[in-house]
Amino acid sequence: MPELTQNPTLKNFQQYVSELETERGFANQTIIDKCLLLGEEVGELFKAVRKSEGLAIDSNSNFTEIGDELTDIFIYLCAIANRKGIDLETAFLKKEEKNKQRIWKSM
């Protein structure tokens, strides 16, 4: 089983997810597969948030912790980036430079 380094970078996480997918037999899933699965995880995050905020929920649904759902989302995000050859660390820094130029107004 692959292992993460101490204090991993985004590159380390992306490599780890790539190795996990190979080990678990998910490496052949398409980007469309991963995007759809990501959407499912976002829905599960919404349910977990509803539960944590005391909103009405389906009592028959299984719920996990918000942190678990965020982790699942992050794994799918890394998998999608890997399929497109996107270095998330570089992409984040580049996008944040664009965001710094934007004017954010309060409503």
Regions found by a protein language model. Name each.
Residues 1-70, 74-107:
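Flexible "arm" and connector segments at domain edges
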